[in-house]
Amino acid sequence: MTNNAAAPLYSLRGLPLIGWRDMSHALNYLFADGQLKQGTLVAINAEKLLTAEDNPEVRALIAAAEFKYADGISVVRSIRKKFPQAQVSRVAGADLWEALMARAGKEGTPVFFVGGKPEVLAQTEAKLRTQWNVNIVGSQDGYFTPEQRQALFARIHASGAKIVTVAMGSPKQELLMRDCREVHPHALYMGVGGTYDVFTGHVKRAPKIWQNLGLEWLYRLLSQPKRITRQMRLLRYLRWHYTGDL
């Protein structure tokens, strides 16, 4: 196994997080020696760590996921503070999803999509086929009942999908991925939140300069002032960070 196919783990609040150096390292890790890994990818930011701290069910879902990675700049900075020798960079979930789709298109990996509004999902599929020739073997928008879940899992299993991405928000997407894996275990699952909306232009992401400065959170706050209540929760995370309680 090549060095790029391995990655160190760094513990924050008792959760082991993968430390990728950059996007290339992430892709080489997930496609180690040409073999796509199986398991669940979960993006970890400060807000998700706070939720995991307060909600035992969410913590159990996150802890059970094989591939927890640093999606938020706050988490990256905390890893660097706690582990000064760590060579870890932020790998944003939306960027990782696009890179994963590009690689899947190149290799013909079968992909199944779950979640999103019907029109957004249709636009996502069309763009992925045009842009990277992604082998889409099935999809289901986010409008289905609990009674329809088992039928959906059966469809996913019958499709032979090797990648399943779920855009339902947390913790709904983590719950669905956990349950689907009982029916279709041999795949890589990824919770992607609002990524389909961003990919199709329905939601505007922060400009690159804001992302590069680690200020994407501030851009979202300025664009959506109603997020202030959620952002205030992060003061608790800052206390953890600056007191070394991570």
Swiss-Prot record:
Q: What is the lineage of its organism?
A: Bacteria, Pseudomonadati, Pseudomonadota, Gammaproteobacteria, Enterobacterales
Q: What is its EC number?
A: 2.4.1.180
Could you list this entry's UniProt keywords, alphabetically sorted.
Answer: Glycosyltransferase, Transferase
Q: Which InterPro entries match?
A: UDP-ManNAcA_Trfase_WecG, WecG_TagA_CpsF
Give GO BP annotations, semicolon-separated. Answer: enterobacterial common antigen biosynthetic process
Q: Which organism is it from?
A: Salmonella typhi
Protein name from the UniProt record: UDP-N-acetyl-D-mannosaminuronic acid transferase
Q: Does the keyword Transferase apply?
A: yes
Catalysis performed (reactions): UDP-N-acetyl-alpha-D-mannosaminouronate + N-acetyl-alpha-D-glucosaminyl-di-trans,octa-cis-undecaprenyl diphosphate = beta-D-ManNAcA-(1->4)-alpha-D-GlcNAc-di-trans,octa-cis-undecaprenyl diphosphate + UDP + H(+)
